[in-house]
Amino acid sequence: MNRWQKIGIGIAIAIVVVVALGFWAQARMRSFFYPVAPPMPAVVSEPMPEILARLESILKTNAPQVLAGLQPGLSAGDIAKLEQQYQVQLPDDIRAVYQWHDGARSSTNYVGDDFIPIHRFVPLEEMLAEKAAQGKGQATLLQRAAYRIFAGQRDSWFCLFSDGVRDGYWFDPKRKPSEGAVFYTFTEDNTFVFFPSAKNLMAGIAKCYEQGAFRVKPGPAPPQLDEDFEKAGKIWEEFGASNQPQ
């Protein structure tokens, strides 16, 4: 074997090592930015339609302004057409949520935009269109590589309740429910709250409104939503599990 062959083999080995380290680093980063759920509470036994009917009743009594800001639900046929158009299959519980109400109307009224404090219920077609447009803009090779490492895990996420700055409540059709396919994120401190089912998420919201953890502030015009974080935190522990130690 001559000198140049040895150099070529050395370069090839170096490339393989660098690529392997790159894949390892990407996997490690993804597990950090998108962890598997810790042990979660049991799935709520109540059927989703009953949970949503109860939530509707609670909103009518405790937060009528929030209920007034929601759009009418979609038919099963409407949802099927959108699934076909955007080539996605929604989980059954998510379909049920959009048959209940198709998100919140866009409004300058604070409560009119928000379904829960600081989070808007995104209409289905808007959510699917935003997901379809994601990543279609021009980007350099370096920008695309950085995205794959730091945010590529979001490719399969769909935002149900959005805070408008890339955090909120999501579902991931590519994850199993036992892995935490429904979850809340707060990127600033890498907090996740995982739910074993969308039923747990909606039941938790119903309880937050029922017990005053979510409420409409008395007095301000336009009305604003408020959150009792201590009370809400205890409620969420009944329905989901955080990746952060308490």
Roles of regions detected by a PLM:
Residues 167-174:
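Short, surface-exposed beta-strand/loop micro-motifs that present aromatic residues
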